[in-house]
């Protein structure tokens, strides 16, 4: 809502406050219930807005109930529109109807402004309009201007309405002459009212001009007195204009302006007197017209009474039609009631039959109760037996697994036993050879003692330490073989699990193909349980396989660590062996310089020891390591190939000709061993 519209509302509210009303009418909330507006309309035109109509407006218990406000405002607006159309013969088709809901709920100022405009039009066009116009003229100039603007908007939107048909036309056949006179008088009254309105507007404009001229005259008189008091006057450019004296140029100009203003004042006063005379003439004409209007109002009152009688007859006719419609509905209901009675009889007969059937069913239920208990017992026994069978099968699987583990351990122990027996035989042979060689080595004992005494203490300690480590590595080779055996067992277990998984997958695929080939609705109940069991077995096997793979990877890591340690030890032994040979050659040279006989004996003993070391140590070590590496590489290659084959088959089966459920039941392809190792 813009500012000027709010100003118009507040000016209309100030005019409305001047009315003597019983209901509160000081603000928008008090006007929103419609009580004050109804009282004002009753005060303006009591013959149209009667006391009976005013009693229909609910004044008490309205409060904040917007529905009661809405009903009051509807009655007020409807009666106002009827007053404009019937009494004033004005059409408000171009005037936007106020939104009553927004007034009742939110007290919208814009909509209240439109409603107050309509009420103002009723006040200006009523029988006692002169008193209300004088009250408006007593208000402030701004309020008068806003009220005049509101009246101009209302005058611009209203139009002369054509003669309406209906009940009035039917009644006007009897009193056509009176209506024609009333229409002519009404038109004369409207023309005079329009002339009065225009003269009032001209009067207001002239009054405004008069006030403006008086203000300008007062200002000029003040300026003239100020100029007479002061001897010198300074112009706009700051130059002194000199004293205002008679006969001077400035005095003549001021005198001429004063004369012009006096002439204009005289013209305005003459025009005002002319307008006063015209207004008096129009007042006399208005009095004559009011007398004629009163006569016409009496005739219009008779017409309204006839209208009321016609409305009463209409209402009675409508009530009669409603009663006839109700009679027809009651007849239909009576027919429906008779039909319902017949249906109730049929239902009673059926209920009697149902009672007999229920009695028979109860007897049958008592008979079947005993058999039902036995069936439930058998079901429980079957469930217990199934649970026992599952437990026994799981125990059997565990025992088989333990048996396989024990067999593997037994084989490993047997192999260790065989290796120990071989070592024992070798040691016995070595002891026998040493016993035989002690006799031959007594002669060369002095040379060896001399050579050992000749060797430095650091090299002797290193050689002793290397010999001890060599023995420990030989002894630990048995543990390494045990680890290799464990790795072989784990690989075998992985192969067994993969074979079982392969058979399970083949069985699943065969069942899925069979279920697809036959009718799925008939075979679904038969193959559902088997597929679920096989899927559970498949998941268990995959978990076991993953565990075995993790064990095999850990064992392979251990084997690789041991291999690296062995290679490092062998390199250290080779380095120390080269140093040892250098030291021996130096010792030989020293001994040759001392005694050539001892040197020849030393050469023979050193060559025998070196040949024994070469024959004993590297050959069996390298052969065992090569065999273990070859077997582990072979098992890895077999596992990777088998897994790739299974994944390719699963990918082919999942991609071609399978239903959505069959694809969901298939297990996802597993990751490769290389990816698991990298993790």
Curated annotation (Swiss-Prot):
Record domain Calponin-homology (CH): where: 6-123
PROSITE patterns recorded: CH (PS50021)
InterPro entries: CH_dom, CH_dom_sf, Hook_C, HOOK_N
A UniProt-annotated Pfam family: HOOK
S-S bridge residues: none
Coiled coil start-end: 135-437, 480-574
UniProt entry keywords in alphabetical sequence: Coiled coil, Cytoplasm, Cytoskeleton, Developmental protein, Endocytosis, Endosome, Microtubule, Synapse
GO biological process: cytoplasmic microtubule organization; cytoskeleton-dependent intracellular transport; determination of adult lifespan; endocytosis
GO molecular function: dynein light intermediate chain binding; microtubule binding; small GTPase binding
GO CC terms in record: centrosome; endosome; microtubule; synapse
Record localization: Cytoplasm, Cytoskeleton; Endosome; Synapse
Transmembrane segments: none
Known partners and oligomeric status: Homodimer. Interacts with microtubules via its N-terminus.
Domain remark from Swiss-Prot or TrEMBL: The coiled coil domain mediates homodimerization.
Cited function: Involved in endocytic trafficking by stabilizing organelles of the endocytic pathway. Probably acts as a cytoskeletal linker protein required to tether endosome vesicles to the cytoskeleton. Involved in modulation of endocytosis at stages required for down-regulation of membrane proteins that control synapse size. Not involved in synaptic vesicle recycling. Required in R7 cells for boss endocytosis into multivesicular bodies (MVBs). Has a role in regulating adult longevity.
Family the entry assigns: Belongs to the hook family.
Protein name (database record): Protein hook
Organism of derivation: Drosophila erecta
């Amino acid at each position: 809502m813009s500012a000027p519209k709010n100003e118009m509302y507040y000016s209309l509210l100030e005019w409305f406050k001047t009315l003597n009303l019983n209901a509160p009418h000081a603000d928008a909330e008090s006007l929103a219930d419609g009580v004050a507006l109804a009282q004002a309309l009753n005060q303006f035109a009591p013959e149209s807005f009667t006391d009976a109509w005013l009693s229909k407006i609910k004044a008490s218990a309205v409060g904040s109930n917007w529905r009661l406000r809405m009903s009051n405002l509807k009655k007020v607006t409807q009666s106002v529109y009827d007053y404009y159309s019937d009494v004033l013969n004005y059409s408000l088709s171009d005037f936007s109807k106020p939104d009553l809901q927004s007034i009742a709920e939110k007290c919208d100022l814009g909509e209240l402004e439109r409603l107050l405009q309509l009420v103002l039009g009723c006040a200006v066009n009523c029988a006692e309009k002169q008193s209300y116009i004088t009250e408006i003229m007593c208000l402030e100039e701004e309020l008068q201007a806003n009220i005049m603007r509101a009246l101009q908007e209302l005058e611009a939107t209203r139009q002369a309405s054509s003669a309406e048909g209906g009940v009035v036309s039917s009644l006007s056949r009897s009193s056509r002459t009176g209506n024609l006179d009333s229409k002519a008088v009404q038109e004369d009254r409207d023309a005079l009212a329009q002339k009065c309105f225009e003269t009032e507007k001209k009067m207001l404009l002239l009054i405004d001009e008069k006030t403006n001229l008086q203000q300008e005259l007062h200002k000029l008189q003040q300026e003239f007195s100020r100029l007479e008091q002061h001897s010198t006057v300074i112009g706009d450019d700051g130059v002194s204009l000199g004293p205002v004296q008679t006969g001077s140029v400035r005095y003549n100009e001021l005198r001429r302006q004063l004369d012009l203003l006096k002439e204009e004042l005289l013209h305005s006063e003459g025009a005002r007197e002319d307008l006063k005379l015209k207004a008096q003439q129009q007042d006399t004409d208005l009095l004559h017209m009011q007398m004629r209007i009163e006569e016409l109002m009496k005739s219009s009152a008779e017409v309204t009474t006839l209208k009321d009688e016609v409305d009463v007859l209409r209402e009675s006719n409508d009530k009669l039609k409603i009663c006839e419609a109700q009679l027809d509905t009651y007849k239909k209901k009576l027919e429906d009631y008779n039909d319902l009675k017949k249906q109730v009889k049929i239902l009673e007969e059926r209920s009697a039959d149902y009672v007999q059937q229920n009695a028979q069913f109860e007897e049958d239920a008592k008979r079947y109760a005993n058999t039902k208990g036995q069936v439930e017992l058998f079901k429980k026994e079957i469930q217990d037996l199934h649970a026992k069978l599952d437990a026994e099968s799981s125990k059997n699987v565990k025992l088989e697994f333990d048996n396989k583990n024990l067999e593997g351990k037994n084989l490993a122990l047997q192999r260790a036993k065989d290796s120990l027996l071989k070592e024992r035989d070798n040691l016995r042979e070595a002891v026998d050879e040493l016993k035989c060689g002690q006799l031959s080595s007594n002669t060369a004992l002095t040379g060896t003692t001399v050579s050992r005494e000749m060797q430095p203490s650091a090299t002797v300690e290193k050689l002793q330490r290397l010999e001890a480590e060599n023995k420990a590595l030989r002894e630990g080779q048995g543990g390494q073989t045990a680890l290799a055996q464990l790795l072989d067992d784990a690989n075998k277990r992985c192969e067994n699990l993969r074979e079982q998984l392969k058979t399970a997958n083949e069985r699943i695929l065969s069942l899925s193909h069979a279920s697809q080939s036959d009718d799925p609705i008939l075979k679904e109940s038969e193959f559902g349980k088997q597929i679920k069991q096989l899927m559970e077995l498949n998941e268990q096997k995959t978990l076991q396989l993953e565990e075995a793979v993790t064990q095999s990877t850990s064992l392979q890591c251990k084997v690789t660590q041991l291999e690296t340690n062995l290679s490092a030890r062998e390199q250290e032994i080779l380095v120390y062996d080269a140093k040892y040979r250098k030291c021996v050659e130096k010792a030989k040279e020293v001994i040759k310089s001392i005694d050539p006989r001892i040197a020849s004996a030393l050469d023979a003993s050193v060559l025998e020891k070196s040949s024994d070391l070469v024959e004993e140590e590297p050959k069996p070590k390298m052969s065992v390591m090569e065999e273990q590496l070859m077997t582990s590489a072979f098992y890895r290659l077999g596992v990777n190939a088998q897994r790739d084959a299974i994944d390719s088959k699963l990918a082919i089966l999942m991609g071609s000709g399978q239903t959505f459920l069959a694809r969901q039941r298939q297990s996802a392809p597993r990751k490769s061993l290389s990816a698991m190792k990298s993790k």
